[in-house]
Amino acid sequence: MTNSSSSKKQAQDQPETSEPTLKSLKTKMTKSDEKQKKLKDIEISVPIVYGNVAFWLGKKASEYQSHKWAVYVRGATNEDISVVVKKVVFQLHSSFNSPTRVIEEPPFEVSESGWGEFEIAMTLHFHSDVCDKPLSLYHHLKLYPEDESGPLTMKKPVVVESYDEIVFPDPSESFLARVQNHPALTFPRLPSGYNLPAPMQVEDTGKKKRGDTKDHSLGQWFMSFSEADELLQLAAARQQVQAHIAKLRRQISLLEGQNQTVKTGSDL
């Protein structure tokens, strides 16, 4: 499964995942340290994407080294999320050397190679003024395309990503002052008459290491997530539900008609 172990342990028996689709979630976190001053009726949202990109090795592929892959957590718009996320802990399959990988700066990702698909746990730890409890995410590493009848190709990787929106209710004043106007975060309309705290002094962005993924080497393969995408999928799902309801109503009407016919015949 790995390039650092000769173990022949089979990959965990996991169900196949679907083609890359928008899985829209909204995860509401618990409040941060109660000692900090809270801003009531305000929520800060951080849209994130997590998943993997996998490349088949072609002629270089072997029985235990068929793919190179990367698993990651990134901002949904490829902005730097380290303003909120302090570190990410990736838990790989036990057959890897050092299966627990701690990434303390962006990009929050792990690159490896191997042959098997398995579930990867990702634990996000936040800065102390954000939230004192971590968030656990789970991703099934996908190496092979859904269409198994077609030939494998080195030109296009397998990409599987999921979207989540982490919501922090009643943020601390220091948190809001530190991150306001940051492009990786979204803020709802503030209550009437509410004044934002003064922005916190930050270091020179020109000297700070760039933490976004806009120029990432895998960026061309990243999926695009937006509210428009979500609305389109919700509309499509609603149409499917309505069509299913209409079909059930027709079936019920047909059954009721048959029952009425049988009842009329028995009364003769």
Swiss-Prot record:
Residues forming coiled coils: 229-263
InterPro entries from the UniProt entry: YEAST_sf, YEATS, YEATS_dom
Origin superkingdom: Eukaryota
Gene Ontology CC terms, in alphabetical order: cytoplasm; NuA4 histone acetyltransferase complex; nucleus; Swr1 complex
Record-level GO BP terms: cell differentiation; chromatin organization; DNA repair; flower development; regulation of DNA-templated transcription; regulation of flower development; regulation of photoperiodism, flowering; regulation of timing of transition from vegetative to reproductive phase
All copies of domain YEATS, residue ranges: 38-182
Region described as Disordered: spans on this chain: 1-36
Disruption-associated phenotype: No visible phenotype, due to the redundancy with TAF14. Modest early flowering. Taf14 and taf14b double mutants show a pleiotropic phenotype that includes small size and abnormal leaf morphology. Taf14 and taf14b double mutants show a reduced H4K5 acetylation in the promoter region of major flowering regulator genes including FLC, CO and SOC1, and a more pronounced early flowering.
Expressed in which tissues: Expressed in roots, leaves, inflorescence and flowering tissues.
Family: Belongs to the YAF9 family.
Subunit structure: Component of the TFIID complex. TFIID is composed of TATA binding protein (TBP) and a number of TBP-associated factors (TAFs) whose MWs range from 14-217 kDa. Interacts with TAF1, TAF4B and TAF12B. Component of the SWR1 chromatin-remodeling complex. Interacts with FLX, a component of the transcription activator complex FRI-C. Interacts with SWC4, and with EAF1A and EAF1B (via HSA domain).
Protein name, UniProt field: Transcription initiation factor TFIID subunit 14b
Organism the protein comes from: Arabidopsis thaliana
The encoding gene: TAF14B
